[in-house]
Amino acid sequence: VQAALPAHPITTQYRETDWAFVTRLLAEAGLAWRYAHAQDADSQATAATLVIFDPQAQAPDSGTIRFHRSDLAEADDAIGAFGERRGVVPTTSTVTSWHSEQVRAVGAQAQAEAGALPPLEVYVQPRAGRFAQEATAQDQAQARLDALRVPHTLHAGAGSARVLAAGAAFTLRQHAQHDGQRFVPVAIEHVAVNNLGQGIVALLDAPELEHGSYRNRFLAVPAATPLRALPQDRPRMPGPQSARVVGVADAALSPSRDHQVRIQFPWQRGDQPTPGGLTDSASTAPGHAPGDQRAGTWVPVAEWVAG
């Protein structure tokens, strides 16, 4: 990852699995991920490493794969079917967020070539104060547009190429239309049949599979396509939430200019959690529960005299 990632005032995992929580944060940051599988030559153990990358990262190279039939008489693996499909996707992404300290809306817009189609815009307005400057908004607009445009050109293929790996680029040869072009698989389905004759071919309803053979099918995009994940909606907390107002020790409570105070939730762990809370079991870096002005985030205060 080469891009600088912003720090959030508070990040909460609520009613979502660890995997859903982590991938949601990665998608919000405009990042993608893949698994790198490795096996030690001296053992039967295998290892899978989660690799996180941005569009500037260079994809691993799976080499050259020819477009040819796949059968037992062939010495090399090949791709036996390879097609292309196009989809109508947005061409413009606009994000805007009101920034109370700057008394203005901070936003940006990213655009892509529309061709003969009319402009198709996606407009997103996140919470207030989401962007401190236009550069951050521009990064978010571009990341969302890149994620929305991944399905613009998809290639569906099938064959026996065992070197294919999601996120790793390959060069296609001997194809009438795509010879010499590079592609990156984004999804692969593997089917391997052993030679023990246990009727797996009949169970899979795939008579084209021979005993002791391997086949796959995959979806790929052109290698120049920026790979990003589309941000997903975060779970919502229904009803009110209790919290404690925090600030500078032994000092009067000082709200912000916009009548906001800083709060610390009881489920935040740290050195000084609220009564009933737990101490931090991992990092004690700022942002957990220090019990002072560094905790949590600013929230507006509603009073009965508010207009």
Where are these regions (language model features)?
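Amphipathic alpha-helical and helix-coil boundary elements used as assembly
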Residues: 1-307
